[in-house]
Amino acid sequence: MHTLDGKKIVVASHNAGKLREFADLMGPFGFEAKSAKDYGLPEPDETGTTFEENAYIKALAAAKATGLPALSDDSGLCVDALDGAPGVYTANWAETPDGSRDFAMAMQRTEVALQEVGAASAEQRKGRFVAVICLAFPDGAAEYYRGEAEGTLVWPPRGELGFGYDPVFLPNGFDKTFGEMSAEEKHGWKPGQAAALSHRARAFQKFAQARLDLPRLGSA
């Protein structure tokens, strides 16, 4: 197994929301996490058909370009009534003609799709957020950590916190959407103290248990 020498790691993302979450999650472990954008790296084309493949594409590109280990995350919303869509194409559903991303439009598109298949009840609107974290090294070696958060899609959107599809995702057992939760509420844990809540925090918790000597307390 490759070692994480030193405290430098590249977060292979240009997504401001993801970068904030990684900074929150890695802060307690003393890592200096710089983004691919900090290094002036371009965004590679995500040509994979699974979360794992896309996470690897991003992490490997950053690791090779910087000579440092790199962490990437590929994530998406998988809705049961839509046969798992948007899935790995979650970000694509937000793309506009000028190449920017409009997640208000993406949430509306998801709601229209649910209405078209007659998904009206909470039971018919179940889904999950999935996140796969890839730790890649310059020589191509890689490890994967997967986290999922089960919940229900609500409409209209609720809350202005978080990012992406957070305002329409109500995690099981809670009365707040991810869009109504603070970062601490959404992550749902502190190292060694509690179980993670969000998909990204659950994936990161597995990474931390494997790589950062985090005790397996409340593991998901």
Curated annotation (Swiss-Prot):
The record's cofactor note says:
Binds 1 Mg(2+) ion per subunit.
The reaction(s) this protein catalyses: XTP + H2O = XMP + diphosphate + H(+); dITP + H2O = dIMP + diphosphate + H(+); ITP + H2O = IMP + diphosphate + H(+)
Gene Ontology cellular-component terms for this entry are: cytosol
**Active site, UniProt feature:** 74
Superkingdom per UniProt: Bacteria
**Name of one Pfam family that matches:** Ham1p_like
Q: Which cofactor does it need?
A: Mg(2+)
What Gene Ontology molecular function terms does this protein carry?
Answer: dITP diphosphatase activity; ITP diphosphatase activity; metal ion binding; nucleotide binding; ribonucleoside triphosphate phosphatase activity; XTP diphosphatase activity
Q: Which UniProt keywords are listed?
A: Hydrolase, Magnesium, Metal-binding, Nucleotide metabolism, Nucleotide-binding
Q: What is its EC number?
A: 3.6.1.66
Listed InterPro entries: dITP/XTP_pyrophosphatase, ITPase-like_fam, RdgB/HAM1
The kind of enzyme this is, by top-level EC class, is hydrolase
Residues annotated as binding substrate: 13-18, 75, 163-166, 186, 199-200
Q: Which SUPFAM superfamilies match?
A: ITPase-like
Q: One of this protein's GO BP terms? A: purine nucleoside triphosphate catabolic process
Q: Where does Mg(2+) bind?
A: 45, 74
The answer to whether the entry has keyword Magnesium is yes
Which family is annotated? Answer: Belongs to the HAM1 NTPase family.
What is the annotated quaternary arrangement, including any partners? Homodimer.
Q: Which NCBIfam families would you find in this protein's record? A: RdgB/HAM1 family non-canonical purine NTP pyrophosphatase (TIGR00042)
Described purpose of this protein according to its UniProt entry:
Pyrophosphatase that catalyzes the hydrolysis of nucleoside triphosphates to their monophosphate derivatives, with a high preference for the non-canonical purine nucleotides XTP (xanthosine triphosphate), dITP (deoxyinosine triphosphate) and ITP. Seems to function as a house-cleaning enzyme that removes non-canonical purine nucleotides from the nucleotide pool, thus preventing their incorporation into DNA/RNA and avoiding chromosomal lesions.
Protein name listed in UniProt: dITP/XTP pyrophosphatase
Species source reads: Mesorhizobium japonicum (strain LMG 29417 / CECT 9101 / MAFF 303099)
